């Protein structure tokens, strides 16, 4: 037990009772009444031991109404959150408290949010592909099981729909669950994701136990302590499913940049000397501690997809640059493709993956992917000629390449289960083998006689040939 000696915005200095010095990361609870007579209950986390018998703590909720001299109680342990089967379908805050007005989250199991990464001996050393059922991803920028994927793309290019499809597919194909951490993003986006997950039955309101995703939010309006620590709460919930239930888990972090930004605010308020571009001197350590917890063990895996905001489009900024060091793959969403109506609008040439190597994915997959990329690259080069004088100015060979590339571009689109509401066509999960087979038929020209519309928004190649037959009948 101690009392508050100083308050600087979301940061408090507390003088503990003699001989009762709390450890770093312990949570303190400040209770009292504000001048208006309302009860105050603020949880803080110890960040620094200052000497002269004081500690500096960062609050996890607003510090309005706190006063010097108020009592603070040391809980003797780090922040702990409820984990387990009770979390899917619910929205929690950084402390694991529900914020969806559906009653309390009562779990017999709680985990502290500060946990060490799995030991090297527990890691799964085998490189394996994490099949998503999305053609463009599995073929050209495959995800690694237990890997980290950066998701790049502006507003309105289909990021939320892609995330929901992945949540849906991991539940159906891998029997896994997902955890989505909203780190310092707009409250509207968190609300949109919640509403859309309910609409597409990823969250089942009638029977929450059938839900496939747990949501943890620390949005833009929260103090920096909450925005920084929600980046630890979400992985903690995911670790339960990996370590105890031995499942494959998908962890979404939206947005990893805001995690760094919140850490920078806390660092400045704690009085640390800033480093490059005003970021915290501990940037690499904070990022590493979070990212190292996201991995495959021999029991299960956490595969993480992180939306990366690039400030002022500067890839050399310390925040995105530190993030890139940890990524295994990047999925870049393109506004140009979205404008053409090709969804998912994943850019096939800009998206990359360290897994696309012949000794990992196999010779057949690698050759097919390279063929697709080469054809699309050759289609990209004469765009100016196509746009102004028209296709007639191209050589016969180039015209054939363009025709095949346009078929490939359309075949990379796919109807999503969660987007059935918008597209009206049933969603499709396409296995990697079917994807490779389809492109192996388009590349050498086996399907040159089919119209390009036949390849748009279909699942596997058999559906494209069936669609072509239907189009021919309608044409007659």
Swiss-Prot record:
It comes from Dicksonia antarctica. It is a peripheral membrane protein. Pfam families: ATP-synt_ab, ATP-synt_ab_N, ATP-synt_VA_C. InterPro entries: AAA+_ATPase (IPR003593), ATP-synt_VA_C (IPR055190), ATP_synth_F1_bsu (IPR005722), ATPase_a/bsu_AS (IPR020003), ATPase_alpha/beta_chains (IPR050053), ATPase_F1/V1/A1_a/bsu_N (IPR004100), ATPase_F1/V1/A1_a/bsu_N_sf (IPR036121), ATPase_F1/V1/A1_a/bsu_nucl-bd (IPR000194). The keyword Ion transport applies. F-type ATPases have 2 components, CF(1) - the catalytic core - and CF(0) - the membrane proton channel. CF(1) has five subunits: alpha(3), beta(3), gamma(1), delta(1), epsilon(1). CF(0) has four main subunits: a(1), b(1), b'(1) and c(9-12). This is ATP synthase subunit beta, chloroplastic. The gene is atpB. ATP binds at residues 153-160. Transmembrane segments: none annotated.
């Amino acid at each position: 037990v101690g009392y508050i000696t100083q308050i600087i915005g979301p940061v408090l200095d507390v003088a503990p009772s003699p001989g009762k010095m709390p450890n770093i990361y312990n949570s303190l609870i400040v209770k009292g009444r504000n001048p208006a007579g309302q009860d105050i209950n603020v949880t803080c986390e110890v960040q620094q031991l200052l000497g002269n018998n004081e500690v500096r703590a960062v609050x996890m909720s607003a510090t309005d109404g706190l006063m010097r001299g108020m009592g603070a109680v040391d809980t003797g342990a780090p922040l702990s959150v409820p984990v387990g089967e009770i979390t899917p379908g619910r929205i929690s805050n950084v402390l694991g408290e529900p914020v969806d007005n559906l009653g309390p989250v009562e779990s017999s199991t709680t985990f502290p949010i500060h946990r060490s990464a799995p030991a090297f001996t527990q890691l799964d050393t085998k490189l394996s592909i994490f099949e998503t059922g999305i053609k463009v991803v599995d073929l050209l920028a495959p995800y690694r099981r237990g890997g980290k994927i950066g998701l790049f793309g502006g507003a309105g290019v289909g990021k939320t729909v892609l995330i929901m499809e992945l949540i849906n597919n991991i539940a159906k194909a891998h029997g896994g669950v997902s955890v989505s951490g909203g780190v310092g993003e707009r409250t509207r986006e968190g609300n949109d994701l919640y509403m859309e997950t309910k609409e597409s039955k990823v969250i089942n309101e009638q029977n929450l136990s059938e839900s496939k995703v747990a949501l943890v939010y620390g949005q833009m309006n929260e103090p920096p302590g909450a925005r920084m620590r929600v980046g630890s709460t979400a992985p903690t919930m995911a670790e339960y499913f990996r370590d105890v239930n031995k499942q494959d888990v998908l962890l979404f972090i939206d947005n990893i940049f805001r995690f760094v930004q919140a850490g920078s605010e806390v660092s400045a308020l704690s009085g640390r000397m800033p480093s490059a571009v005003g970021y915290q001197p501990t940037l690499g350590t904070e990022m590493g501690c979070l990212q190292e917890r996201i991995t495959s063990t021999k029991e299960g895996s956490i595969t993480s997809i992180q939306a990366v905001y690039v400030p002022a489009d500067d890839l050399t900024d310390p925040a995105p640059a530190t993030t890139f060091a940890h990524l295994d793959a990047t999925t870049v969403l393109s506004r140009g493709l979205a404008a053409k109506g090709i969804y998912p609008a994943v850019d096939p040439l800009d998206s990359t993956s360290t897994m696309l190597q012949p000794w990992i994915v196999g010779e057949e997959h690698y050759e097919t992917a390279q063929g697709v990329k080469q054809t699309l690259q050759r289609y990209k080069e004469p765009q100016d000629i196509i746009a102004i004088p028209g296709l007639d100015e191209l050589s016969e060979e180039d015209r054939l390449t363009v025709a095949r590339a346009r078929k490939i571009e359309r075949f990379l689109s796919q109807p999503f289960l969660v987007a059935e509401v918008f597209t009206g066509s049933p969603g499709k999960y396409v296995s990697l083998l079917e994807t490779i087979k389809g492109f192996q038929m388009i590349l050498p020209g086996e399907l040159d006689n089919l119209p390009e519309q036949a390849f748009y928004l279909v699942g596997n190649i058999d559906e494209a040939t069936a669609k072509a037959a239907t189009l021919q009948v309608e044409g007659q």
